[in-house]
Amino acid sequence: MGNKIKAVFFDLDGTLVNTLESLKKTMNDTMEHYSLEGVSLEETKKFVGTGSKKFVERTLEKNAQVWYDKAEKWEEKDEEKAMDLDLKGDEVMEQLEEAYDYYRSIFPKNCTYKVEAYPGIISCLDNLKEKGIFRVCITNKPKEEAVIILQKLFAPDSFNMVLGDNAKVPLKPNPDMLLYACKELGISSEEAIMVGDTKTDLDAAKNAGMISIGCLYGFRDKKELEVHGAKHLVKDGDELWQILKEYYL
């Protein structure tokens, strides 16, 4: 039996909502704008989780690496050519700020593209509401984009609070957003549980001194969730509710 909780904090992408297609589309539209190679769904899974800017950076790194690999092959044959190829890779990375701004500018029109709530999540939220448990969405995505997605898929009173990237508060795995939510709700970190699908979420929970639950249906594998300290692993929203009800309510 765990401590009785008063709040459940949820990550967004890969936890509440499957947003892979929208993330992939926005990135590929961005890369097309710069005549660069886009990402697959698997790459999207791997690259997201630590904020939109990091997603853009990792995609640019993938493109730059093509030039760096070519440069390495030419190092012994033609040093000057190798340096030129290296510079092309550097030029790709120099576009980070501009590419990130472009990504942000087009994301609002794509953010609900093929998005859907994961099985059992809506009923889990309803059950928590019925029990008087606070429901908070804490995401590294910009808050305004998160709100658009949540408004499309969930009832208006599904969440007591939504926190996201505002360029002021450090992102997960820093615990500041989690601790801020606790303060605003008037609870201790031991009275909240973090539910997420990546090490970013689980590390944030650990740094805030709270228990975490890992979502096997999200963007990362079981091993990552286990290594980063998930107390429980769940396959869908129904199992999440059962765990919460049995151990923490």
Residue ranges with predicted function:
Residues 27, 121-150:
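Substrate-recognition element of Asp-dependent hydrolases with the DxDx(T/V) motif
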Residues 58-123, 131:
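Metal-dependent phosphoesterase signature
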Residues 29, 33, 54, 58, ...:
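Solvent-exposed, charged/polar functional surfaces in cytosolic regulatory/catalytic domains
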Residues 14, 18, 39, 43, ...:
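Residues at secondary-structure transition points
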Residues 19, 23, 55, 95, ...:
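Hydrophobic alpha-helical packing elements
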